[in-house]
């Protein structure tokens, strides 16, 4: 209880200059965060580059070259982490046959995502969180499966992040299930992620959030000349493509287009990531992805799951999707010497802190409602206990309608609360919290009478 009371955010007003935030960190999460190693991340990136190409249509039989050698090595590394975890991390290939598409898949191809599943310890908590990077690579010609395609930043960096998360987190126990994934065939059309998303849907996984770390190792922006190792972007969609007609009406009437599940997930990553990782500013980008680009979170978003993309702040396109060469004095190609491994470590730590805090937290409160039975300048909220672990209390979060992030948090021990703020002027949400300060995702209230 002492911890819980001390973590409450204290704000004298909504202007950022007048806010004071008390930071309290869970020691177990802090220990995990500090264990993330830039040396391990660099070692993984360089090993993946050593396979010469990880093109999804490349050699699957060689022990030293091509996509087959790469996936076998990733699996063996995850199995090594599993042994260190006492066998709790379950490692498998997620195998499927991708049909020819007349574009980037010339002939049917057996493809494999590599999964490390860390089962939750609470039988009543069926939440699943998926974190990934894609291990395939490409050069300038997307269909050239033989040319050297190092793919150090795109996306050995994200694969290394997911693997380092598996190494560290598999030594600990969490309420719910975590799945660490090295995705295949992102460059060919998000085929690995599409297969896994469909599997999750078909098998009834309760995917509460999916994160892809894609291009998380560069700190220099081409053309602008910006150098920034303190910022990272999180992309999230606002309006789900699977909205029901009722949800469309409710969104239009309440102005909740910025409060979809993916946006809440992204806000959570910003709040908790910045709580644990120093010198890191998480920028919330309110769109699904960049122009002309896509990522492995998209197939999950298209099936209604909360998918977000983590990617570097400034991009160098001379070192993405480029054949390695020197031309007019410019170095092209995605080589490991161009990766900022300390930066990738920061991004990995942000992932870890947010995932661990979520996976240790109680589930979200149920049937969260905002009372709209009459005209009033007060706001009345009520909700029901979450399934599973009983929280010690709840945070009611609040923000101005123009703010991208929650600005105030009020601790409430009950399942109802009344505030002297008008619901017409602010957005509200409710999240569960345990005695160690682990918060659930925020639930946006629905109108009740």
Label the model's feature ranges.
Residues 43-119:
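A non-catalytic alpha/beta surface segment that caps or lines the substrate-entry region
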């Amino acid at each position: 209880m002492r911890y819980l009371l001390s973590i409450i955010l204290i704000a004298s007003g909504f202007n950022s200059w007048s806010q004071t935030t008390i930071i309290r960190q869970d020691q177990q999460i802090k220990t995990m965060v500090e264990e993330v190693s830039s040396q391990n991340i660099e070692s993984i990136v360089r090993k993946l580059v050593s396979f010469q190409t990880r093109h999804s249509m490349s050699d699957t039989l060689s022990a030293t070259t091509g996509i087959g050698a790469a996936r076998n090595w990733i699996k063996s590394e995850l199995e090594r982490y599993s042994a260190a975890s006492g066998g709790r991390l379950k490692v498998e290939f997620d195998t499927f046959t991708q049909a020819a598409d007349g574009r980037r898949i010339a002939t049917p191809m057996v493809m494999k995502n590599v999964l490390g599943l860390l089962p939750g310890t609470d039988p009543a908590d069926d939440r699943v969180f998926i974190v990934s990077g894609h291990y395939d690579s490409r050069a300038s010609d997307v269909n050239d499966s033989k040319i050297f395609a190092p793919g150090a930043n795109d996306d050995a960096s994200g694969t290394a992040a997911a693997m380092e998360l598996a190494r560290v987190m598999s030594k600990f126990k969490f309420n719910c299930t975590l799945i660490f994934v090295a995705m295949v065939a992102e460059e060919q059309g998000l085929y690995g992620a599409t297969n896994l998303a469909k599997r999750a849907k078909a098998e009834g996984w309760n995917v509460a959030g999916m994160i892809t770390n894609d291009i998380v190792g560069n700190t220099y922006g081409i053309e602008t000349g910006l150098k920034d190792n303190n910022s990272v972007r999180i992309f999230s969609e606002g309006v789900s493509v699977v909205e029901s007609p009722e949800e469309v009406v409710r969104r239009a009437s309440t102005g909740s287009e910025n409060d979809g599940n993916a946006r809440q997930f992204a806000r959570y990553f910003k709040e908790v990531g910045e709580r644990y990782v120093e010198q890191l500013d998480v920028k919330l980008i309110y769109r699904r992805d960049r122009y002309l680009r896509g990522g492995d979170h998209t197939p999950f978003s298209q099936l209604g799951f909360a998918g977000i993309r983590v990617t570097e702040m400034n991009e160098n396109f001379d070192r993405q999707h480029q054949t390695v060469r020197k031309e007019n004095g410019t170095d092209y190609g995605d080589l490991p010497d161009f990766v900022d491994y300390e930066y990738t470590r920061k991004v990995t730590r942000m992932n870890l802190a947010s995932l661990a805090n979520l996976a240790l937290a109680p589930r979200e409160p149920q049937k969260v409602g905002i009372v709209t039975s009459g005209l009033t300048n007060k706001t009345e909220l009520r909700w029901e206990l979450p399934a599973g672990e009983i929280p010690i209390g709840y945070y009611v979060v609040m923000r101005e309608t123009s703010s991208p992030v929650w600005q105030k948090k009020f601790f409430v021990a009950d399942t109802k609360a009344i505030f002297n703020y008008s619901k017409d002027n602010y957005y509200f949400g409710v999240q569960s919290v345990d005695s160690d300060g682990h918060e659930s995702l925020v639930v946006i209230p629905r109108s009740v009478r």
